[in-house]
Amino acid sequence: MCFLNKKTIFTIMIEHITKGIKISVNTTFNGTSYRRGNLYYDFSYSISIENNSNETVKLTERHWEIFDTLNKTEIIEGAGVIGQTPILNPNDTYAYTSGCFLSSNLGAMKGHYTMINQMNLDKFKVAIPTFQLITPLLLN
């Protein structure tokens, strides 16, 4: 059995713009670990949210779809990101890092943020583009 414990940062940046809100994603493979007696692949992702619109917006909710080639799709929903509900003025950027464990060495994530325009209180969804979670061995 091969154990991968070398942290690998993927330099491919995925970007998407919805209503002037630019989402950029970088992923990192952090190695393998055992949890509850099972082998898991540890991935982290860094997301930058850039407000290129002329409006102030607040990120209120997140919706994730996590695809693992050995398991069913997992849906994660909740308030804000990493315990925060950031407000972004025009030209502001908010960045954070989070992660997930997969049962396999290949997966993907996608989703959306729910934002509220702070001027007119309209809600809208900002797409998070699909990004791959891949171990380095699969890239060879």
Regions picked out by a protein language model, each given a short descriptive name:
Residues G31-Y41, N54-E55, I87-N89, L102-S104:
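Short, solvent-exposed beta-strand/turn "edge" segments of beta-rich domains on protein surfaces
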Residues I49-S53:
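Asparagine-centered strand-capping/turn motif at beta-strand->loop junctions
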Residues E55-E74:
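Short acidic, flexible loop segments centered on an aromatic residue
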Residues F101-N140:
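Terminal connector regions
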Residues E74-L106:
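Intrinsically disordered, low-complexity Pro/Gly/Ser/Thr-rich segments with frequent PxxP/GP/PP motifs
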Residues I12-Y40:
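Low-complexity, acidic Ser/Thr/Pro/Gly-rich terminal tails and inter-domain linkers that flank the onset
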Residues Y41-S46, K110:
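Short, solvent-exposed loop/turn segments enriched in Ser/Thr/Gly
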